[in-house]
Amino acid sequence: MQLRPLGRSGLQVSPLAFGGNVFGWTVDETLSFRLLDAWVDAGFNFVDTADVYSRWAPGHAGGESEMIIGKWLRQSGKRNRVVLATKVGKPMGDGKFGLSPAYIREAVDASLRRLKTDHIDLYQSHDDDAATPMEDTLGTFAELIKAGKVRAIGASNFSAPRLVESLDVAERLGLPRYESLQPLYNLCDRAVFEDALEPLCLERGVGVINFYALAAGFLTGKYRSEADVSKSARGATTIKKYLNRRGLRILAALDEAAKRYDATPGQVAIAWQMARPAITAPIASATSIVQLDELMAATRLQLDADAIGSLDDASVETVRDAT
């Protein structure tokens, strides 16, 4: 498998990352282990999670995903075959959130315990924290890198101005810089990333590992009507917003390309992202071996210029699309 450099970190990652939000939430421990084994045994090495996964689920406190990954790492002996990414900053209860030095030091040790490892390959700021000076946050990350607890750092959900500020502060003070950005990006959600973040990442050599690569499943073609959406737990909020003129136009273009390439709409959606010059590795999740096989096969699909152009055109926003 052709690995890709993640920014200037020195890390080499597979062209697709497994999104660990499902572990301990919609996927139990046994199936999580099977999915992770299949992923790594197929040559993929990139796994992304966060300390907060899956705090939103009833009865969960956060850390469930990290604990399952950690147990798998210990039992499988495959730690040296994984580029392990996690995040810090989302609310974890009891006032624990943000990017203050004290909280980062506490949170990284908690993540290391749950992950049953002595280092995190990519430690990401899950959200921006305007209340903490950028130099304090980056300085703390520098301590963690020097201590061997973290290899590289990344940012998630940062605006272009704040990412620029962080890169400039790091350069000016000789501190570690964010080597990756984790933004929302897919065929349905293009404008925010492409307008300012994409050119910035290309110019500054920042890797991009975008989340919601399949728009919460919408780009698989599974949801084409209100009735379909009502069957999903996410339907009322996340997926329903995509079910409009533009969304249906995107699905039609995906269907056309899928037929041409003997692929699925979801595979085409992933392949379109992988063809973008700024994208290092989209993040996608699977809840079954069948879904995982489909995701992995998407990395072998190379769209030609005509297919990419058709998808580009179909996903352009117009004033009538919100209806």
Residue locations for each model-derived region?
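N-terminal binding-site loop/beta-alpha segment at the start of enzyme catalytic domains
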Residues: 1-81, 146
